[in-house]
Amino acid sequence: GEVKDLNVIIKADVQGTAEAIAESGKRLSNKEVQVRVLRTASGDISENDVNLAASSEAIIIGFNVQPDANANRVKESAGVDVRTYS
């Protein structure tokens, strides 16, 4: 079968957490799914994150962060999947 790409943007409250999660995510790649981490950063989910996700068909995963007001507005119209965990 064909390998599917899963593009991911990871945001967290601190950079070290984001980097650790990105490394764990990359290890989830297998012969069916290739996890591609496009961005890892600290801070709330921004409109720029949503725009990158929309243009690259990525999902955004946030840990101890939330989308800011602009990101919330844009994610709906762009159809971007944003998942937050705390």
Residue ranges and their predicted role:
Residues 1-86:
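Conserved structured catalytic cores and adjacent interaction surfaces
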